[in-house]
């Protein structure tokens, strides 16, 4: 599934939710950071098959500048992968940014 998400993101087959736009401004995460992270060495760390707006997953990745990001997105079976939210994970709440403490 990770490869399918990366493939869609790399070919522009994704969209941002209003929530992610609002939250990235508040959290000082640039849109280009989200785009580069989702297309790089990303890893699905949590799966939400029963999410209320449709199946989604939490992806961990690192930007080109080395910033860790968590990106929640829809499953790639939609025509466009929807980026739901993105944030820099708190190292005190995550082990290696991949496992919840």
Predicted regions: what is each one?
Residues 1-101:
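Ribonuclease/tRNase effector modules and their secretory precursors
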């Amino acid at each position: 599934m990770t490869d399918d998400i990366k493939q869609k993101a790399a070919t522009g087959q994704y969209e941002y939710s209003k929530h992610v736009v609002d939250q990235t401004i508040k959290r000082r995460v640039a849109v280009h950071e989200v785009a580069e992270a989702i297309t790089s060495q990303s890893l699905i760390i949590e799966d939400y098959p029963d999410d209320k707006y449709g199946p989604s997953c939490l992806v961990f990745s690192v930007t080109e500048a080395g910033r860790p990001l968590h990106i929640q997105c829809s499953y790639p079976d939609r025509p466009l992968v929807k980026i739901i939210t993105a944030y820099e994970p708190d190292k005190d709440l995550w082990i290696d940014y991949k496992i919840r403490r």
